């Protein structure tokens, strides 16, 4: 069975399936595109093209649901860490399968990105989001868009909503 919205379909996953977190591979591209597209079609995140996802595939951490009760496994969640400057990276593309909402999987993926940022000795992270309370629970604070690093704006110029952005800027120092 699949969950469908405006021709965007994702496989149904069993919510009790075991979860494994790992870095993305090119073979994961279509599943990532479908999950992000599912939420983008609902207006809850930005669309990401296959070509952009392929360019940035090394940025992403995946949560994979294993087989359970005869149901096939699949992509339960995705989140990326995208380097913007030597002192800043963006947590981006966070999408959780509907069967796994509210189970701590988003936090687990953001933590994986944070751990990678710490390994890289990054002093700070930021995120654009419509989900401010979630990022606050992950230790981020809301900041004014004008306080963001100039490199952020070069990324934003590619966005269809650049002129009318309604996302919230969130920031987290890593200590």
What are the residue ranges of the model-derived segments?
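A short beta-loop-alpha structural element at the N-terminal edge
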Residues: 13, 18-32
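Conserved beta-strand in the GNAT
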Residues: 62, 73-83, 87-95
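A short, internal acetyl-CoA/4′-phosphopantetheine-binding micro-motif in the GNAT/acyltransferase core
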Residues: 94-101, 130-131
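Conserved acetyl-CoA-binding loop-helix of GNAT-fold acetyltransferases
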Residues: 102-115, 127
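Short acidic N-proximal helix/loop "leader" segments that mark the beginning
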Residues: 1-14
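Active-site rim helix/loop that mediates acceptor-substrate recognition in acyltransferases
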Residues: 33-69, 157
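C-terminal "cap" of GNAT-fold acetyltransferases
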Residues: 148-175
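Conserved active-site alpha-helix within GNAT-family acetyltransferase domains
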Residues: 119, 123, 129-156
